[in-house]
């Protein structure tokens, strides 16, 4: 019996030792020399490769910001295109380091192992219809056929909204963004539903964009953000504070253009952000100039928003809830101190 107990103790020690020496996500990324980021392959403004295969978008730039913090190079990132229904499985499998793919933070997703680090875009679900349909409200869609993507909160919200308003629904479900958009554009459905940001983006892809309109109703809360696996608190914090650094930089007026000059600032908050004072990078396993690297390479949150989905982009979405907390929005970062 004593030898059996000793064997069990030895086995338990071996398992514990193996677990404790397993490389974390940060070390794995450093070893391979790049970050692997799960991305949307077809949503303009958030994640979409250009004609040269270069990914661009708000979510893409958050991935590049993480790469900049780690490698001082925003291009040391591989983008893995992922369909909506495959997001939880691929994240859990370890194929990607982080998922930043217009994904709604929900209770069921978090309890299933997707740990959301914050909200990089506050959104809500809406509807798009052809103007010739003569509908000016989602409440007039009783009996309509609606194109929707499978495996999304959008699909669930659609059913809830029609049921709550005692309307008949014909949901026409597709596996990918591209299939859903194509079906609506071809006339397969009366309406198309997704996050409002996605509607403005997808409208640009229609054969005749001016023939379509986004209805006024927003039927859900869609807090979109990055998610990581639940087993690596250091990595969770790196992804989380990358976003907070982007927000803090905008709040303090630190931009891609002036970040070098701002290192000379006497403002203590700016000096802490840029690593001139303190040693806040150490707690994350990063260099002390981690946030400086982020801003130098990708800019602050406001700059990322403007060029990808804001007034400086073809999509031209107003900041709305995504403005800073002191400008009528919800974007807010804890202090770096």
Language-model segments: residues:
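Acidic, polar ligand-binding/catalytic clefts
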Residues: 64, 68, 72-140, 196-219, ...
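Extracytoplasmic small-molecule ligand-binding "clamshell" domains
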Residues: 30-99, 286, 301, 324, ...
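C-terminal functional modules
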Residues: 270, 276-337
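Sec/Tat signal peptide C-region and signal peptidase I cleavage site
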Residues: 15, 19-23
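Sec-exported extracytoplasmic/periplasmic mature domains
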Residues: 30-31, 67-75, 92, 96, ...
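Bacterial N-terminal signal peptides that target proteins for export
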Residues: 1-9
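Bilobed "Venus flytrap"/periplasmic-binding protein-like clamshell domains
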Residues: 36-45, 55-70, 104, 123-175, ...
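Extended ligand-binding regions for polar small-molecule ligands
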Residues: 61-64, 68-70, 132-135, 139, ...
